[in-house]
């Protein structure tokens, strides 16, 4: 496949500033929203910060601040006819009752797709088109204390944290993923981690290839 050697969706205007999930286990909502914000900008040209809190409160297939997955959240957005802006359903960082009275979707998606797992080339192909939701093992000390550079620290592959891959590249012959986290701008490289890419394990760094998925958007909102 003829894929670009590198891509950074931040430079293409498809990524809103890094957010902070706080003490709520809502990483799945942030991962989902970042992917939807991305494809919406790519398709429509508009970059709109969208509502994680709506997903936390309203995605009944997930568990709010106690965890969840991206695919049921994508499916909620499909079924709901879209997702609210951050402005109209702001983040509170705690579980809440779904507020249907403020339901005013501004961005819709058509469906979602899973990236073929255990294959970094499949993930690269997807990320060449748009930001992609992924899981990583973020429980280890090395990950949590990451500051900068290409992350080569130790981690396993358990899917305990959700993030969004917003690009990839190579530095000094070392390939990396550009991954957006939701732990605020003071963590890592201004809220991002560059994780080593094209490693020998098909699960990818910290299991990044295991549960990757992305929203499909065909037209306007």
From Swiss-Prot:
Family: Belongs to the peptidase C1 family.
Glycosylation: residue positions: 99, 156
Gene3D superfamilies: Cysteine proteinases (3.90.70.10)
Catalytic site: 27, 161
Function: Cysteine proteinase with a specific activity toward peptides with a proline residue at the P2 position.
Pfam families listed in its UniProt record: Peptidase_C1
Protein name according to UniProt: Zingipain-2
EC nos: 3.4.22.67
One GO molecular-function entry: cysteine-type peptidase activity
Membrane spanning stretches: none
Cysteines engaged in disulfide bonds, as pairs: 24-65, 58-98, 155-206
UniProt catalytic activity: Preferential cleavage of peptides with a proline residue at the P2 position
Listed GO biological process terms: proteolysis
Species for this entry: Zingiber officinale
PANTHER family, per database record: CYSTEINE PROTEASE FAMILY C1-RELATED
Recorded superkingdom: Eukaryota
InterPro entries: Papain-like_cys_pep_sf, Pept_cys_AS, Pept_his_AS, Peptidase_C1A, Peptidase_C1A_C, Peptidase_C1A_papain-like
SMART domains in alphabetical order: Pept_C1
This protein's UniProt keywords: Disulfide bond, Glycoprotein, Hydrolase, Protease, Thiol protease
């Amino acid at each position: 496949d003829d894929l670009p050697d590198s891509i950074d969706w931040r430079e293409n205007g498809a990524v809103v500033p890094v957010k902070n999930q706080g003490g709520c286990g809502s990483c799945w909502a942030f991962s989902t929203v970042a992917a939807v914000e991305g494809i919406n900008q790519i398709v429509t040209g508009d970059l709109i910060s969208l509502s994680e809190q709506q997903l936390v409160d309203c995605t009944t297939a997930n568990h709010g601040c106690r965890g969840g997955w991206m695919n049921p959240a994508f499916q909620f957005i499909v079924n709901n006819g879209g997702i609210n802006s951050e402005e109209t359903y702001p983040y509170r960082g705690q579980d809440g009752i779904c507020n249907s009275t403020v339901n005013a979707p501004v961005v819709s998606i058509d469906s979602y797709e899973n990236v073929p797992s255990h294959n970094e080339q499949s993930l690269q192909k997807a990320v060449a088109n748009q930001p992609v939701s992924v899981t990583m093992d973020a429980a280890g000390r090395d990950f949590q204390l990451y500051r900068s550079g290409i992350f080569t620290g130790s981690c396993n592959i358990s899917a305990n944290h959700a993030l969004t891959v917003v690009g990839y590249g190579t530095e000094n012959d070392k390939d990396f993923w550009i991954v957006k986290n939701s732990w605020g701008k003071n963590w890592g490289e201004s809220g991002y981690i560059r994780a080593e890419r094209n490693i020998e394990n098909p699960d990818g760094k910290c299991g990044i290839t295991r549960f990757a998925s992305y929203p499909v958007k065909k037209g306007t909102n």
